[in-house]
Structures are given as structure tokens and as C-alpha cells.
């Protein structure tokens, strides 16, 4: 997990998280007042979390499919990690703060294998191997 701190005119470019299955973002703080948008086409999008495309279904689709109101502090948005997303900049004083994380889904067999590997690693370190 990591925190993201954005201030006036800062943004998060379009990206996805290819190293996992599920991603999430929770809005922790949002500026009380956002100045009017610089350009007309940004109206209503300032500071917003935007999901684009269809994830693995269509990697070339870039039309926005959903806008999430980042001012809803405390909301947790879960989404497929392959889904392209970005955060638009905002104008005004204050901070947009969020908490993000990536997660993977594994089987019990995979988990048992990881635990066994870690045990062996620990034992080898104890023996100086």
C-alpha cells in the first residue's frame, strides 16, 4: 500500500497495474474548494479519478467509462488492476490525498508453497547458507 499526495496542478497519468489482479484507491482528503476549471472540457473532472477502457477486454479503448468523485472522502474503489486509470489535476489550495494498494488472488496451494519457500529461506539464513 502507498499514499498519494497531490497539490494544485498535479495529476496522475493514465496507467494500470500489471503485476496483480485487484487494485484499490481510497480518498482520504480533498480540497474544500476547487477553483473554476482552466478549460471548459475539464468541467466536473477536476481532481477526479477516471477509469478508461475495458482493462484486458480492450487495451486500445481510451474513452472514459467512469468518473469517480474523489471528494467522497472515505470511499474505497476496488477495480481490476488491468483497468487503465488516471487522476485529473485541480486548481486551488489544498491537498488531494489517497491511499492505494494492489492485491493478488492466489490458491491455498500457492500460499502453502510460498510459506514453505520462506521457511527454507529462514532455515538457510540461520545455517549461513
Locate predicted features.
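Catalytic core of non-heme Fe(II) oxygenases with the double-stranded beta-helix
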Residues: 2-78, 88, 112
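Catalytic core of Fe(II)/2-oxoglutarate
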Residues: 57-129
Amino acid at each position: 500500500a502507498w499514499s498519494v499526495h497531490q497539490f494544485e496542478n498535479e495529476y496522475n497519468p493514465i496507467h494500470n497495474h500489471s503485476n496483480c489482479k485487484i487494485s484499490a484507491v481510497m480518498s482520504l482528503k480533498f480540497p474544500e474548494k476547487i477553483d473554476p476549471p482552466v478549460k471548459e472540457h475539464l468541467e466536473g473532472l477536476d481532481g477526479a479519478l477516471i477509469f478508461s477502457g475495458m482493462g484486458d477486454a480492450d487495451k486500445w479503448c481510451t474513452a472514459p467509462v467512469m468518473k469517480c468523485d474523489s471528494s467522497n472522502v472515505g470511499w474505497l474503489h476496488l477495480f481490476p488492476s488491468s483497468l487503465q486509470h488516471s487522476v485529473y489535476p485541480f486548481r486551488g489550495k489544498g491537498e488531494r490525498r489517497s491511499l492505494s494498494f494492489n492485491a493478488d488472488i492466489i490458491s491455498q496451494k500457492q500460499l502453502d508453497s510460498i510459506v514453505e519457500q520462506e521457511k527454507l529461506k529462514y532455515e538457510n539464513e540461520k545455517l549461513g547458507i
